[in-house]
């Protein structure tokens, strides 16, 4: 709109014209605004139509999309319903499965606890069984040890019984021999007393001759020449049957003194033999195998019959009075039968048990019962002994005696250690008990039984 030209007249502010002008100006402004608003409205209507069309198109499209979405929603809802059902079913199934598994786990736990308890009980029972087994093994070993000790004690006692029987026989023989030796000693004493009396009578007759003439003295000398001759020292000198052969007085006195010393030695030895005879004792049951073995060794190392036989044989050689009782017969009578030798094992290793591996009782074989040695069997198996060493006269006989077994053999023993040699097991005679060595001279002949006493050269008085 164009502006309207107004006259240039001064107007007052409160004048009518001025107000009309103002109102007219406002009218013009309002009209312009209305036109502008109409134009804007038209534009707005056009744009709104376009917008409405677009919106309608969008609405149709959105309706289509909504329908599609609703269809999809319905499909999804159906799917959700199905999945819900499936989830519920799966949940129910999982719950049932979980309950079943829980029940199974609880049952397995109970079974595991039961198995643990059974295993614990089994282990305890196994420990008890092992302990019983150990106790049984130790008891069995103890019983076996006691059984072996009992077998050893039985074997040792059997050996002691056999040795006791042999010693009893030897004791009886020794008593008889001592009795015979006592009789021979008394016989020798009587002989020595008679000889001393004859010597004293002869000395008295020589020292105190009766008064006689020369003729009587010559006759007396001729009579005495056939019987005896007086020496310078005043001792009687025996003569032979052919002529008078004087004997040195020192030799005759030495013989007499030697005989006296031998008699004294014989008496002392007989007394020693009587005191050293073993007394028969009943063997007691050994407390242990070591004491039993030591007892057996004590029996073996005690004064044996070999020592007694040696003493008696030496006494028989010294006296030599009765030819009827010769040395061989005395040795045959006094020779002991071989006693069982129970040897011990080597103690250096600490072992004191006998070796019983060959025992038939351990191997299940019956033991053969054999008779005990008797006095007659001991006499029957006697062997002559050496009068000096108390052993068989020959080396072969000594070996045979060492290896000979007793009448009652201990077949249940198999001894590993060798027995002591006979020379070591024999007790040595003290030097004082040995007879005095006589002067080397020809031994006088033994008198015949029942004959009178004879002098040094065998002449009867």
Curated annotation (Swiss-Prot):
What are the start and end residues of every segment in region (Disordered)?
266-300, 316-461
Q: Which GO terms label this protein's molecular function in UniProt?
A: microtubule binding
Stretches of Polar residues bias are at 366-379, 391-409
Subcellular locations according to the entry: Cytoplasm, Cytoskeleton
Note the coiled coil stretches, chain numbering.
21-206
Q: Show the stretches that span the lipid bilayer.
A: none
Biological processes per GO annotation: centrosome localization; chromosome segregation; establishment of chromosome localization; establishment of mitotic spindle orientation; microtubule nucleation; vesicle transport along microtubule
A GO CC annotation recorded here is: microtubule
Give the InterPro entries listed for this entry. Answer: NUDE (IPR033494)
Question: Which segments show compositional bias classed as Low complexity?
Answer: 288-297, 320-329, 410-424
Report the superkingdom from the record: Eukaryota
> Where is it chiefly localized?
cytoplasm
Keywords, A to Z? Coiled coil, Cytoplasm, Cytoskeleton, Microtubule, Transport
Which family does this protein fall into?
Answer: Belongs to the nudE family.
**Oligomeric and partner information:** Self-associates. Interacts with PAC1.
Could you tell me what this protein does? Required for nuclear migration.
Protein name, as recorded: Nuclear distribution protein nudE homolog 1
Give the source lineage, highest ranks first: Eukaryota, Fungi, Dikarya, Ascomycota, Saccharomycotina
């Amino acid at each position: 709109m164009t502006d309207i030209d107004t006259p240039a007249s001064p107007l007052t502010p409160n004048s009518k014209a001025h107000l009309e002008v103002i109102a007219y100006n406002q009218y013009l402004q309002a009209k312009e605004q209305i036109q502008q608003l109409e134009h804007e409205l038209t534009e707005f209507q056009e744009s709104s139509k376009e917008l409405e069309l677009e919106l309608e198109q969008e609405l149709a499209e959105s309706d289509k999309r909504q329908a599609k979405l609703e269809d999809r929603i319905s499909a999804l809802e159906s799917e959700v319903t199905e999945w819900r059902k499936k989830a519920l079913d799966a949940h129910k199934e999982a719950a049932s499965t979980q309950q079943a598994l829980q029940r199974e786990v609880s049952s397995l736990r109970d079974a595991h606890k039961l198995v643990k308890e059974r295993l614990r009980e089994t282990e305890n029972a196994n420990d008890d069984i092992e302990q019983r087994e150990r106790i049984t093994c130790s008891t069995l070993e103890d019983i076996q040890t006691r059984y072996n000790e009992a077998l050893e004690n039985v074997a040792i006692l059997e050996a002691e019984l056999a040795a006791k029987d042999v010693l009893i026989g030897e004791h009886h023989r020794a008593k008889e021999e001592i009795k015979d030796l006592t009789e021979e000693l008394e016989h020798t004493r009587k002989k020595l007393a008679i000889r001393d009396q004859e010597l004293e009578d002869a000395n008295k007759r020589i020292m105190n001759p009766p008064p006689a003439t020369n003729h009587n003295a010559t006759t007396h000398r001729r009579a005495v020449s056939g019987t005896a001759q007086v020496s310078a020292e005043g001792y009687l000198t025996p003569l032979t049957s052919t002529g008078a052969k004087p004997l040195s007085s020192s030799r005759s006195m030495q013989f007499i003194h030697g005989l006296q010393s031998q008699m004294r030695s014989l008496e002392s030895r007989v007394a020693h033999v009587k005191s050293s005879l073993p007394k028969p004792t009943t063997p007691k049951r050994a407390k242990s195998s070591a004491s039993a073995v030591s007892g057996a060794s004590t029996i073996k190392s005690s004064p044996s019959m070999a020592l007694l036989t040696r003493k008696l044989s030496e006494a028989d050689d010294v006296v030599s009075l009765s030819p009827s009782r010769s040395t061989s017969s005395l040795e045959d009578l006094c020779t002991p039968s071989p006693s069982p030798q129970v040897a011990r094992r080597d103690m250096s290793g600490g072992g004191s048990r006998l070796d019983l591996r060959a025992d038939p009782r351990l191997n299940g074989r019956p033991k053969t019962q054999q008779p005990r040695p008797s006095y007659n069997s001991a006499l029957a198996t006697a062997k002559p002994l050496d009068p000096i060493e108390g052993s068989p006269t020959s080396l072969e006989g000594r070996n045979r005696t060492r290896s000979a077994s007793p009448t009652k053999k201990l077949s249940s023993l198999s001894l590993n250690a060798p027995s002591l040699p006979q020379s070591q097991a024999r007790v040595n005679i003290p030097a004082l008990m040995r007879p005095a060595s006589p002067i080397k001279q020809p031994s006088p002949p033994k008198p015949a039984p029942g004959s009178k006493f004879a002098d040094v050269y065998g002449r009867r008085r």
